[in-house]
Amino acid sequence: MGKYNLILSEYLSFVYNSQSAVQIPIYYSSNSELEKRCIEFHAKCVDSSKKGLSLKPLFEEYKDVIDNATLLSILSYSYDKYNAVERKLVNYAKGKPLEADLTANEIDYENNKITSELFQSAEEYTDSLMDPAILTSLSSNLNAVMFWLERHSNDVADANKIYKRRLDLFTIVASTINKYGVPRHNEKYRYEYEVMKDKPYYLVTWANSSIEMLMSVFSHEDYLIAKELIILSYSNRSTLAKLVSSPMSILVALIDINGTFITNEELELEFSDKYVKAIVPDQIFDELQEMIDNMRKAGLVDIPRMIQEWLVDCSLEKFTLMSKIYSWSFHVGFRKQKMIDAALDQLKTEYTEDVDGEMYNEYTMLIRDEIVKMLEVPVKHDDHLLRDSELAGLLSMSSASNGESRQLKFGRKTIFSTKKNMHVMDDIAHGRYTPGVIPPVNVDRPIPLGRRDVPGRRTRIIFILPYEYFIAQHAVVEKMLSYAKHTREYAEFYSQSNQLLSYGDVTRFLSSNSMVLYTDVSQWDSSQHNTQPFRKGIIMGLDMLSNMTNDPKVVQTLNLYKQTQINLMDSYVQIPDGNVIKKIQYGAVASGEKQTKAANSIANLALIKTVLSRIANKYSFITKIIRVDGDDNYAVLQFNTDVTKQMVQDVSNDVRYIYSRMNAKVKALVSTVGIEIAKRYIAGGKIFFRAGINLLNNEKRGQSTQWDQAAILYSNYIVNKLRGFETDREFILTKIIQMTSVAITGSLRLFPSERVLTTNSTFKVFDSEDFIIEYGTTNDEVYIQRAFMSLSSQKSGIADEIASSQTFKNYVNKLSDQLLISKNVIVSKGIAVTEKAKLNSYAPVYLEKRRAQISALLTMLQKPVSFKSNKITINDILRDIKPFFITSEANLPIQYRKFMPTLPNNVQYVIQCIGSRTYQIEDSGSKSSISKLISKYSVYKPSIEELYKVISLREQEIQLYLVSLGVPPVDAGTYVGSRIYSQDKYKILESYVYNLLSINYGCYQLFNFNSPDLEKLIRIPFKGKIPAVTFILHLYAKLEIINYAIKNGAWISLFCNYPKSEMIKLWKKMWNITALRSPYTSANFFQD
């Protein structure tokens, strides 16, 4: 078994090191004879440990179990009270504790003062500014570090250097914490006033960040960066990350391009050996120098020195260090401000009368025209989505907060809840549901606020609007997005594109006579100056659209949308400030509407067009591309002469002047070789991503359990690793050990083994090998998967009670009746299931399900129930296929150049051999004809799981299904009788399998699965015409080959002789595959 189990047993003896501690391994086997021995072994272990005897003789006697069975879990118990952390910590606390500089930050509470100085009493105290918001504690983190240090104290050579670096950094952390004592957390992993009052307020979150950083140190440079960030972030809780990462926006403009990848007409990346010189006016260097000076003023020494040294020759080879600094800067943790400061931040900008009215006008008109362009076709055709917009809104209503807690009655049960979906049901039941009236958000009904915290930026506020706003906007926004899907300007939404294509778009037009203008407009989006022109542009567009249709339902939809904009022009917000709730007039645009992303993109596109039209008055150029991506926009301009320093400087100053005419406080830069935006940056013709996901601090508390968070932690670690920030894997595994353990009683704990946590069951948390998703096919693996499936679906009494109440039933019936032309069980049941699933976000339901799952898990981890599940998983399919494959060695040369320098070597190698993928593989079934047919006549969107079920029904049932959703009987009949239907069967099966195999997640999303280089390693003689079987055989072969290459850096070729007789069996099985949802899959989804 793998490394995990080894670390697990070592960790247990490290933590529970007293005389009374006992660890009992529990084994299982799918072989019934061996299974009996496993049970005996366990019984005897428990017996011996009760008598206080050594377990060693049993390990000898049951050697067969230990050698041949599979470890299921380790039962550990220990009676000593758990102050072991403090005792161990003292040994590392040999240094001088840090002293916080109490004047480092402008806002008083952002200084790392002793808690009782910031909060006089427990009533005043809040942990919201420093809450790590993760279900693991500082003491566990300290334990994990000390465990690593102890394990590696005898390392030699280079490994010893890493040990010394980490030890040195940990000494700083340990000494500082030891001075005040380790803060004890409560059962919810929060730190209360009593614990914190005599300690620095930010101690915990700082220590978590520091541990995350020091466990990511490998090289000497890492050490210097980490040391500086650890020491300074103890005092500077506000601007450190921003200071350190600011220079990047200029650095990308300094490296010559010598060979790059460009997007060609076929939307593929293709190598181009062009050379583009970086042309940098002196003014830019002055700005950069100023940034570096600001870093020095803040006490940074080594990081500015590294940047300064790199500036000597600006080489691409050494740029990885710059990229590393940029990523590291985010790991100082989140900047969490009080809501009042976050809100007032936007309101501080003063109004200036001296603005260019003409530009504002042009901006508004561009927004208006874009809105019209986006919605013209659906409005003129009286699109059914716009006619049934209310129903569409209800069907996709989220279960997020509606801004206030209400008392709701479901049958005999009375509940307090803030959830939108529950409010809607309650309102409908009591005749209070009036989607035709958009409630005002003025001084009488101010908007409650949510928050968004990000490292390196100020806290931003989020409107929590009443659900009527969502219903009013949903359908229209969906239409806007589907327009954006096939409009290249909208980089974020453009159909199936990804970051790599956007990268090739920029580099494609860079040459000696072009420059690229890139602007971060996040300040503008939330500024007061944007509000009026922005909302007015939308309103004017909607007015024009209303005149294009005579359908009263479409007009009503547009009018309600318009009403949301009118209401929001006069918005007030409520902000808790101490014990008072302040009402403040808020004249800016905030996130929280359904339209936020779409509308911001439209506005940012209008903004850059306005600017370019002004620049065009003075220079002659062709705009090669304009792109907007979230808060950033960029454009490539091609001139008719070669670009000179003077030109760059002039254009740069003119652009800035034009923005200032609109009072837009934005960061606009001009370069000839690279750009830097929030999502990615291009330097030296290569693409980079910021590896800035925090591991040991979270932005906010959700309702995920420890298992979920362990999976999220692992998933974050993987994303960072792909982007060039690697944390020690042993440390991550230690955290998983801690976070997945289950307490039985105070002194008794159960630790699941690697097999439990990596088999794709409902409990999967991580992969035994980074980047490789394994689907176990051995007897023991399939056995344990079956066992877990038997306890996967947990019931919740509360949910059942709500679902059986009249209120809930009436709501589901209302939806079904509005949606369906004729009764249809599949759809009605689908709606009921979806609505019931939404109840999961109501904490009591979630907790109830979780408790049931944990207790079932406890039973299972102590003795797996042999359970003959009749469900078929993807593992069963792969298990059937596997024996027919024959492996032989093969050879693939490296033939593509690197374009993403931060990738780990093994992943980089695979891409260099088979090429990269620039598109998302369709795994939702939305490309199938049946899906298109349904969306043509109905607002209902079946999931891939539902399509998979439906398409395998009898033809008549499919026809009924379609007709009930409003598809005309003629069309439904034609569909079922045509060839398209059989193509769909294949398409949907393909999508479903891709979805199950997570082909669009992790590093698989980077590989070109249709690479001819990969195809030629696979030989499968063609027998009979079952495309689905051919597909699964090929896909299996590709995954096997790629996984082998990631693991071994070498290639194999596969030959498969699949018997014709087996094919039809396999094909039948393929229509009964059950999808498994686990913390692991939700974590993948969470990355999205």
From Swiss-Prot:
Entry keywords, A to Z: Magnesium, Nucleotide-binding, Nucleotidyltransferase, RNA-binding, RNA-directed RNA polymerase, Transferase, Viral RNA replication, Virion
Enzyme's top EC category: transferase
Subcellular location(s) per record: Virion
UniProt-listed GO biological process terms: DNA-templated transcription; viral genome replication
EC number annotated for this UniProt entry: 2.7.7.48
GO MF term set: nucleotide binding; RNA binding; RNA-directed RNA polymerase activity
Species of the source: Rotavirus A (strain RVA/Human/United States/Wa/1974/G1P1A[8]) (RV-A)
Coiled coil spans: none
Cofactor entry: Mg(2+)
Protein name per Swiss-Prot or TrEMBL: RNA-directed RNA polymerase
